[in-house]
């Protein structure tokens, strides 16, 4: 029987089926995730990536030293903090 390779995808989804051999020993085989599990994993992964990109761009913009943007920067920082708190509660 062909053995599946242990890829980052199969490691991260961790879908394991346990089978019994004729001699009573148990073997573990990585199973294929269904469509719902795949979509759930995809959405969790992309949400984490999007949040990281959004955080990086906000931090980069907030680090600018332009005096004209100081009031905007203050308002944006307050909005970002409230957004972060809101994201943690959801």
Curated annotation (Swiss-Prot):
Taken from the record, one Pfam family name reads PB1-F2
Query: Per the record's keyword annotation, is Phosphoprotein included, yes or no?
Result: no
Q: Where in the cell is it found?
A: Host mitochondrion inner membrane; Host nucleus; Host cytoplasm, Host cytosol
Report if keyword Membrane is assigned.
yes
- Keywords, ordered alphabetically: Apoptosis, Host cytoplasm, Host membrane, Host mitochondrion, Host mitochondrion inner membrane, Host nucleus, Host-virus interaction, Inhibition of host innate immune response by virus, Inhibition of host MAVS by virus, Inhibition of host RLR pathway by virus, Membrane, Modulation of host cell apoptosis by virus, Viral immunoevasion
Q: Which domain of life is it from?
A: Viruses
Coarsely, its chief localization is host cell
GO CC field = host cell cytosol; host cell mitochondrial inner membrane; host cell nucleus; membrane
Map out region (Disordered) in residue numbers: 1-30
Site positions (Low pathogenicity) are 66
From its record, what is one biological process in GO terms?
A: symbiont-mediated suppression of host cytoplasmic pattern recognition receptor signaling pathway via inhibition of MAVS activity
**Signal peptide residue numbers:** none
Q: What does this protein do?
A: Plays an important role in promoting lung pathology in both primary viral infection and secondary bacterial infection. Promotes alteration of mitochondrial morphology, dissipation of mitochondrial membrane potential, and cell death. Alternatively, inhibits the production of interferon in the infected cell at the level of host mitochondrial antiviral signaling MAVS. Its level of expression differs greatly depending on which cell type is infected, in a manner that is independent of the levels of expression of other viral proteins. Monocytic cells are more affected than epithelial cells.
Quote the record's miscellaneous comment: Is not encoded in all strains, and seems to be dispensable for replication.
The UniProt entry, under HAMAP family, shows: INFV_PB1F2
**Family statement drawn from the similarity comment of this UniProt entry:** Belongs to the influenza viruses PB1-F2 family.
How this chain assembles, per its entry, is: Oligomer. Interacts with human SLC25A6/ANT3 and VDAC1. Interacts with host MAVS.
Q: What is this protein called?
A: Protein PB1-F2
Q: What is the lineage of its organism?
A: Viruses, Riboviria, Orthornavirae, Negarnaviricota, Polyploviricotina
